[in-house]
Amino acid sequence: MSPAAGAPGSGPGRRRLPALDVRRFSPVRKSRPVPPRAPGRALEVLVLLCSVAAAVAAVAQPLALGRTLDLLLRDGDAGWWLPLSAALLLGELLLDSATSLFTGRCNATWTASVRTRALRGLLRTAPEHARPYPPGDIGTRLTLNAADAGGAPAARAALAASLITPLGALVALALVDVWVALCVLTGLPALALLLRSFARDTGATVAAYQRTQSLIASRLLEALEGADTIGAAGTGERERARVLAPLAELAAQGRHMWALHGRALGRSGVLVPLLTLAATAVGGLRLAAGELSVGDLLAVGRYAQLTAGVGAAASLLGAIVRAREARRRTRELERMTATVYGTRRLPPNGPGELRLCGVRVLRGGREVLRADGVRVPGGSTVAVVGRSGAGKSVLAAVAGRLIDPDEGYVLLDGVRLDRLTHEALRTEVAYAFERPVLGEGTIAEAVADGARRSSRERVRQAARAAGADGFVRRLPHGYDTPLPRAPLSGGEHQRLGLARAFAHAGRLLVLDDATSSLDTATEHEVDLALRRSVRPGTRLVVAHRPSVADRADLVLWLEDGQVRAVGTHRELWHTAGYREVFGAGAGAGAGAGAGAGADAGAGADAGPGPDSGAATAVGGSGPGPVRRPEPEEARP
């Protein structure tokens, strides 16, 4: 793994894409298609009308100019044909200008619409559904691909007009002289085959180009997040090579794409003059035979150019092909499976009892969590411990319905989480994470934002409970300091995430490794404030330190995705496997007690001991004895 992958040195100052954490606070509703914005449709129609009108003016011009020339040569006065010709020229110029104006607005409007729908689809889904898409890939889809896809409506309108021009010119040419029209018609199949081949070959190349572009963007974002680690390790050149490794493939696809484009333009550039020359030659012969006038010959030459101009549609066709591939990529985000909420609410004044019934979570066909009959009493604090990959974060996500289990269900105060309304769930379940995403607003806004916006006083109380009030007040503008201008350390950033969770604490509060960047003394102070200053409720804490597990009422020990045992920290410490989770090993001995390996002072306000009544209320499908591991003799 590259140093960027873990990004331990990325720090809070390096903003991550809010792909996952924003979703946790987004008002997700039942999935339904988002209709296109009406202004985009109106602008598309305007582009089409202006393009078609310009094409009609272009087709009418040669006839008017030819008639004007004949009248001037014969009578010296063209009458109303001269101002008509001038009006057609001026009209085409104005219509082309209007087309350019409306095309720009149409592209911008549709790009915003595509980007909004893709982003909504991303925010509606559960985090595990977005996990296969790296942040760089998502960023590319929402920026470059959305812009390409947004240009499709205007490109289609322009393509339709570009086809009207040669078809109208061919009809007008047939009205002037059928023999010249037949001459031009013989060359059109070659142009049609040219466009068909260009569209077929370009599609695969554009798709490969966009995939490679997304891969480079993803690797670059990883490197930027881990820039501190890369600099400290001195692996900048290696990371540069890793990020740019796909560049050769990108260059090859880009050269191939432009080669196809150039080949199409080159071939059409040969065919168009040949057709024009042939039409002019036939027209000259017809003029010599007395079948055409000088004005008719002028019209014939111009109509031959317009008819053969179908080859100019290659660039528009290329834009449509790129837009089609880009739209396919943005539509993948738009159509992601949405989280559906129910209509029920929690019973009032519930204690926050949590039950996991027959829960199984699979990833890639592999079981990462199995929890059946696990009951957490309301108002208790339960530490979730286990080795890396044991399923701690998965259990924390399932407990508050950040993800839905593949089998089974979760109850909160007797109500299934998947049957709760979004407001009921997010009001009563709060989260704090290892790397909170706080946005770009002020500190007060970051802490206050949630399912319900917290008051200023509640924000301050939550900040004091999280140990953040002191350093926030020392900032130049206090709570009104914009986060991008706040020089926060990793621990301070994490404390603001805790403050946000405390400000919105309901009957269930889940701390997913949310104190990993705090020193042990600060962590202990936060734990005390959590018990005294935050709304009472059930706490589910993903713990990596023995001191945290010791202060909890109960410990839920996970191993290989399954519940190994449930009990107090002091009871489980008698098991060598449990001690090894904290790196204590068998040599620590059962007599080391709950505080073994804990940080200094962490046990000052430890939770209940082995005789606590809370121990008998957790572990099975109902009240009963705690499931404990088989005791192992401590080795000296």
Swiss-Prot record:
What is the induction comment? Probably part of the ramC-ramS-ramA-ramB operon.
**Could you tell me the Gene Ontology terms of the biological process aspect for this record?**
transmembrane transport
- Which residues bind ATP per the record? 386-393
- Annotated region (Disordered) at 589-636
| Keywords, alphabetical | ATP-binding, Cell membrane, Membrane, Nucleotide-binding, Transmembrane, Transmembrane helix, Transport
Query: Domain ABC transmembrane type-1 spans what residues?
Result: 45-322
Where found, per UniProt? Cell membrane
Organism of derivation: Streptomyces coelicolor (strain ATCC BAA-471 / A3(2) / M145)
Q: For bias kind Basic and acidic residues, which ranges apply? A: 627-636
Which top-level group of life is the source organism from?
Bacteria
Establish whether keyword ATP-binding is in the entry. Answer: yes
What is this protein's name? ABC transporter ATP-binding protein RamA
Q: What does the UniProt function comment say about this protein?
A: Probably involved in exporting SapB from the cell. Expression of the ram locus (ramA, ramB and ramR) induces rapid aerial mycelium formation in S.lividans.
List the molecular function annotations (GO) for this entry: ABC-type transporter activity; ATP binding; ATP hydrolysis activity; ATPase-coupled lipid transmembrane transporter activity
Phenotype reported upon loss of the gene: Deletion of the ramC-ramS-ramA-ramB operon on rich medium leads to an initially bald (no aerial hyphae) phenotype; after 4 days develops a substantial aerial mycelium. No expression of SapB, normal expression of chaplins. Wild-type mycelium on minimal medium. A complete chaplin-negative plus ram-negative strain (deletion of ramR or the ramC-ramS-ramA-ramB operon) leads to the complete loss of robust aerial hyphae.
Q: Which InterPro entries match?
A: AAA+_ATPase, ABC1_TM_dom, ABC1_TM_sf, ABC_transporter-like_ATP-bd, P-loop_NTPase, Type_1_exporter
Q: What family is it from?
A: Belongs to the ABC transporter superfamily.
What spans are recorded as compositionally biased (Low complexity)? 607-618
Gene3D superfamilies xrefs: ABC transporter type 1, transmembrane domain (1.20.1560.10), P-loop containing nucleotide triphosphate hydrolases (3.40.50.300)
